[in-house]
Structure formats: C-alpha cells, structure tokens
C-alpha cells in the first residue's frame, strides 16, 4: 500500500468499517506504519497510525485535499 490509497478498517480495529486515505507511509520504520486520515463529518479529519494488519486496500484516491493539479 502507498500514499493516497483508500483503505477500510477491518474487524481487528475499533474503527472497523470506516474508510480512510493513507497520508504517510513510514516504510523505513520497523514495523511498517501508515498514517491514515479518516474524514469525520462536521469535525474534520482524524489521523490514525496502523501497521497494516487491520486495514484492507479498497482503491486509489483521485481527489486528495491539499494537492494541486499540474
């Protein structure tokens, strides 16, 4: 998995069923950790670290907040 991938938390996580977008890949650390942004309606974005064991790949995000089109 890489930055801007859409993931869903599985049953191993308290956020199970929630969708998020990988914001950072801390691939150089061991174990590998991902910073995942989970949009919360009317509240903004919560950021959660996960080692990849409780997320499943859904797809690639096309529009990502903070990115500009070239």
Regions found by a protein language model. Give the residues of each.
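Solvent-exposed strand-loop boundary residues in beta-sheet-rich modules
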Residues: 13, 26, 40-42
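Short, acidic/hydrophobic/Gly-rich beta-strand patch recurrent on exposed beta strands
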Residues: 8, 21, 35-39
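Intrinsically disordered, low-complexity, charged/polar segments
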Residues: 39-70
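Short aromatic-glycine-enriched beta-strand elements
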Residues: 30-36, 45
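Short coil-to-beta transition motif at edge beta-strands of beta-rich domains
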Residues: 1-13, 19
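Intrinsically disordered, low-complexity regulatory regions enriched in Ser/Pro/Gly/Thr
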Residues: 1, 28-29
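Short beta-strand-centered aromatic/proline hotspots
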Residues: 16-26
């Amino acid at each position: 998995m890489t930055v801007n991938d859409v993931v869903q938390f599985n049953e191993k996580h308290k956020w199970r069923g929630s969708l998020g977008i990988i914001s950072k890949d801390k691939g150089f650390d061991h174990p590998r950790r991902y910073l995942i942004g989970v949009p919360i309606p009317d509240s903004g974005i919560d950021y959660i670290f996960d080692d990849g064991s409780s997320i499943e790949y859904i797809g690639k995000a096309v529009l990502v907040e903070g990115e500009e089109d070239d």
